[in-house]
Amino acid sequence: MKPKITIIIPCYNSEKWIEQCAMSCLNQTYESVEVIAVDNESSDGTVAILNDIKNNNPELIISSAKNIYPNCWDEAREEGFRLMTGDYVITIGSDDYIDLEYVDKCMSVILSSPKNIKAMQTPIQGIRQQGEEFVSTGIIQHSYKSKEQFKKLCLTKCPVNTPSVIYSSELYHRGLLETKPKEYGGAADYDLYCNLIDNDVFIYPFPQWLGFYYRWHPEQPTWNVHKESRM
């Protein structure tokens, strides 16, 4: 049997998107997938929608976490880590979605060299609403060939597509996926990547887009972080 992958979906006021996200994860063609949705104290219909989905998909695990830190998903992700039973784990935003073969394609790459690939990221396809339709905003990808090159990129930007990263669960059990939202807020992932590279964990940047859709919209935490940084 192939290694299990856990997909964690942190949710906060996601009633517009959560069904598309959750179903894209539940319907993956990869044979061993665990999906955990963690609500972060939503005040809209997110939880009701998740419960409706679970009625037809009992394998969906639903949990909750306190919403302590603004503009980040760390509390919900930590709850997902606590519950996960997968050999690998990915955290997908509740406003994003993936092609049905995304996990299968990613795991084929990882399992081609499991001792060397403990973490992997992929390019993401940006999408934005335009009227009644969603249009592409282009592919976002990062390229580096060594840990040293990665460290240099970290001096000027975050060279990681955060929601696309698949980690070996071994990293969590070694304490290497811990984040510090109290200190860094929405930039806690950036600190995580610097800590990983300092511990010789290379996030392999797969060069081809495999089916990840990243939704741009004014309500997302990324926009809020940018707004606050300009104040």
Write out the residue ranges for each language-model feature.
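Conserved nucleotide-sugar donor-binding catalytic segment
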Residues: Y144-R230
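Conserved donor NDP-sugar-binding/catalytic core segment of glycosyltransferases
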Residues: E101-S136
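Short loop->beta transition adjacent to catalytic acidic/histidine clusters or analogous donor-positioning motifs
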Residues: K2-I5, L26-A37, G45, P58-I61
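A conserved acidic beta->alpha catalytic loop
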Residues: D39-A48, N67-Y69, G93
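Short aromatic/hydrophobic "clamp" motif used to bind/position activated sugar donors
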Residues: V89
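Acidic helix N-cap motif at the loop->helix transition within catalytic regions
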Residues: E19, D44-I53, Y97, E101
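Short, well-formed alpha-helical segments that are part of the catalytic scaffolds
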Residues: S14-N27
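Glycine-rich, basic loop-to-helix element that forms the pyrophosphate-binding segment
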Residues: A65-M84
